[in-house]
């Protein structure tokens, strides 16, 4: 049923092992709001770090050619590495993807829905290390390496109000055994979307799709409420499932 309590009914063992779910299925939201959908001018994720955040700078082939402060990287449009981690769980014949709703404290795209976890690769950090760190910071998941699949790379470019964001994303897919989340302060909510509904958005350009909160309530997700990762699902995620005959 559309309003089924996905976590409670589909994964009852989750509640048994973790003592139940919060009624609202959310992490507590931090007070105050920052940002308006513009690229961040802050040095770190929340703009309050004592030291500037240093990022590796790469060429268009992804080779590291230097390092620079995050602010400089965005202002000058320097290519830099990031990670995207799609998350899914499988129950019977149904595949569910899990997406985050970005907190209102985020400098860029607050309140938008996005891939399970995303983030910059830090200086002297590998992409796999970055994926594992971001998944734990944002979604409260300790990644098991044997469930983490590397899919490939995509390039993304955005020019917003004078800031140029040029990223080379290392894309991963993580198979959740039991979809239990403990979102950090940068994530206000986790949403479950069936593969069927997701493909209405990705393949048919549907104006909205239906997802569910973690306590099973239906949520209608408009296309304009999503961060844009155009073609990533079709290019990298779909082939993974097709090659393995999943879903």
Question: What do these predicted ranges mean?
Answer:
Residues 4, 8-22, 111, 152-159, ...:
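Nudix hydrolase/Nudix homology domain
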Residues 30-48:
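Long, intrinsically disordered low-complexity tandem-repeat segments
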Residues 49-92:
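Acidic, metal-coordinating catalytic segment for phosphate/diphosphate chemistry
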Residues 53, 81-83, 117, 150, ...:
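Residues that flank catalytic or metal-binding motifs in active/ligand-binding sites
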Residues 72-83, 93-133, 137:
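Conserved Nudix-box catalytic region and its N-terminal flanking loop in Nudix hydrolases
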Residues 136-140, 157:
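Internal, conserved structured core segments that host functional sites
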Residues 142-152:
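A short coil-to-beta-strand element that immediately follows conserved catalytic motifs
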């Amino acid at each position: 049923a559309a309003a089924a309590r996905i976590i409670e009914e589909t994964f009852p063992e989750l509640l048994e092992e973790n003592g139940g779910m919060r009624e609202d299925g959310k992490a507590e939201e931090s007070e105050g709001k920052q940002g308006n959908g513009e690229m961040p001018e802050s040095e770190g994720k929340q703009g309050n770090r004592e030291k500037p955040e240093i990022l590796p700078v790469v060429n268009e082939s992804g080779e590291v050619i230097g390092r620079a402060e995050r602010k400089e990287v965005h202002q000058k449009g320097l290519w830099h590495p990031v990670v995207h981690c799609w998350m899914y769980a499988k129950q019977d014949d149904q595949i569910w993807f899990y997406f985050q709703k970005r907190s209102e404290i985020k400098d860029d795209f607050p309140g938008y829905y996005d891939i399970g976890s995303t983030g910059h690769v830090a200086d002297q950090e590998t992409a796999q290390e970055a994926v594992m760190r971001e998944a734990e910071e944002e979604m409260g998941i300790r990644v098991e390496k044997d469930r983490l699949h590397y899919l490939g790379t995509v390039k993304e470019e955005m020019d917003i109000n004078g800031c140029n964001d040029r990223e080379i994303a290392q894309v991963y897919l993580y198979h959740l055994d039991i979809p239990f989340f403990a979102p950090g302060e940068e994530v206000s909510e986790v949403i479950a979307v069936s593969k069927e509904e997701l493909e209405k958005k990705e393949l048919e350009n549907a104006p909205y799709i239906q997802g569910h909160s973690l306590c099973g309530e239906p949520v209608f997700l408009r296309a304009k409420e999503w961060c844009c990762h155009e073609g990533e699902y079709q290019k990298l995620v779909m082939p993974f499932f097709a090659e393995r005959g999943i879903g």
